[in-house]
Amino acid sequence: MRVVIALGANLGNPRAQLEEAIEKLREVIVIEVISSFYETKPFKVSEDQPNYINAVLIGETKLEAEQLMKELLDIEERLGRKRSTVNAARSIDLDIIDFQGMVINSKNLTLPHPRAYERGFVLQPWLEIDPEAQLTGFGAVKELLAALI
């Protein structure tokens, strides 16, 4: 199954955190392409936070979507992610953005990612590695990104 995963971090050494997360992701997916790393300002936060480093990767997995989500949460925990408030600073954040174009609305997972369409820090790196990318239910990634600018 083709999967698009967004990565982000703004605590500790964010670039190193992303690189370590990518290595751990190789345990559960075959990574085909990884975007450049992008430095972005925190999105929709009330407190002062450091800038984020963000990236997107595309890969293949044999796992089902919910099992892959469990693996991502486990990787986050192993890399020191502490969950507190929404949009809090974080050592690592891993999100499934798209999973083979599936639409899933379960207790533990919503696909496609419900806020990806409004997040330039997801759309820009995704467009870099897949210029024809489509976000199921929302349209072409290049058009979604253009609408944000």
Give short role names for the model-derived ranges.
Residues R2, Y52-N54:
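Short, solvent-exposed beta-strand edge segments and adjacent coil->beta transition regions
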